[in-house]
Amino acid sequence: MKRTLLALALLAIGTAQAAEERPSNAADQTGLAVTIYNGDLALVKDARKVKVNNGDNYLAWRDVSARMQPETALLRSLDGKKLTLLEQNFDFDLLTPQKLLEESVGDSVRVIRHQPITGVEVSEYATVLAANEGVVLKFSDRVEASLPNPGRIAFMGVPANLRDRPTLSMVFRADVAPTGFLTPANATAEQGMELSYLTGGLTWKADYVAELSSKEDSIDLNGWVTLTNTSGTAYNNARLQLIAGTVNRTQPERAPMPMMAKTMAMADAAAPMQEEGLFEYHLYTLDRLTNLLDNQTKQVALLSAQKVKVDKEFRLTGGDWYYAGQYGDLGKKLKPSVFMEFTNKAEKGENTGLGVPLPKGIVRVYKKDSAGRAQFIGEDRIDHTAKGETVKLKLGEAFDITADKKQTDFQKLAVTGFNARPGGLIETAYQLEIRNAKSEKVVVTVVEPIAGEWQMLQESHPHKKETAHSAVWEISVPAEGKVTLTWRVRVKY
């Protein structure tokens, strides 16, 4: 009988130990990897050393992202041990005075009053009846709707569902014995484990700074990655990787939480990130461990390229709408857009630093003035740009180049529908006078979109058919001079 009671007692002790929740926090980490995607998505791989019981374990994995998607969480053993996950709960209801009060409704608390004259503290017990817009307390002889001033509440404990930080609570079954050995019921051992999950609250974007040379024929280009962490936890000593490209997701993206980053950290520009292809995307890896604190924005160097050859273009683009009707004057002092263009490739025999895939982002361009001070001259957004592709940046509008455009003739030669559309044959003519106030000659690219089937009948300068629906002229305008471009076109709608 005594032996039976002793066995039952030992079994009860073992069960209590197994049921006891064991916490694990960031101090247990042996490795941390974070891969951030476009579109408020990241993959976190958190490796830790955890003390594990033989049999059922109750583990509180603390310091996870508050924006984690718990359905994506995956726990695995790094030591090859058998591990069976039975249950998991994502506890993101964080401990605050108000939450503690709300969870204590119906419970007994101790109310402590301070006597301002005597300085003596007096306490009595009360039951929390409500915690909405204040607190309602029921004492043995009365009900009060607020705390005494000065006064405070002492709670009996913290409810199990309230955490001081985001926590993934897990129940799993483990076998801690070496292969081929029997395991005592109360055996414990340290085991390497990795928790991986997808989360929001981690974003990245690329930004580029280009300095245009004095001759305006080359740029020095530096790329930066701006990382923002609003996920509710910090990632210290993390291996950081970035995915550029559009990853398909079956659920709509959640909007980023309305939080402002508290700090801005700038990293050294000397070590660009390493790039490689991954499936149909591109992966960028930081070659050192980094810290990304909660509510922090950090910048790290992406690339650095020197003396990248560029071409400047003045481009005046019209519209296809005025080819179908009679309009006369089409604009005075029209200003060409200024573009800067370069090819994402390394020149033969030159190590410019280009020739790698460029993530989408904003390129900001600067040029030094006569005193050597860099001045901002424009910016434009680029899409993901593969190796060998052309980057074209619109920087603004030309100040010293203007143009006047007018329609000089319009004839309906045939009508097969109401007015000119949806059917008809039209002949129309135009005049474009381009003036150059600069002290050097310029070449202006004139682009005229023309809908329908068209035929150029007359023109003062030869055009190129850039596409089926556009005519393009390259017009050289002398310094402080002007040139008039005329053309007549027949259009069938």
Predicted region positions:
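N-terminal signal peptide c-region/cleavage motif recognized by signal peptidases
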Residues: 13-15
